[in-house]
Amino acid sequence: MSDHPNAALARRIGEAFNSGDTTAMADALADDIEWHEIGRAEPIVGKAALAARFGMDSGAPPPYQITAELHDVIANDDHTISLATAHATKDGRTFDYRVAEIYHIKDGKITARWAFSDDTQAINDFFQGA
């Protein structure tokens, strides 16, 4: 059985994220993306603002690295839910956490993303200042 097209899109953006392929990541996002991060009250709105947040516009690497091991993707015509374990490194420290991501998808592009975890406070503490 083949993946739903939106599940395949979620898998592709996960692979692009893990490999640092910012072009593939940007191609998967709508220009007016709403990006909701774990532990942040306000979303990042727009591809340009998201690129600035992650340093993609400067060419400089971010002060941390994150990869995710995808466990499952559930999809329909409007949404995907991805379950993963994230592995982060920052300033010589490492941190693993579970994450659920929900994508709203329209016309083959991710228009909104929400991320949730089992320990928001630990995530905020780890990434403080980033």
For each feature predicted by the language model, list its residue ranges.
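Short, cysteine-centered beta-strand-loop-beta hairpins and adjacent loop/turn segments enriched
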Residues: 60-63, 88-96
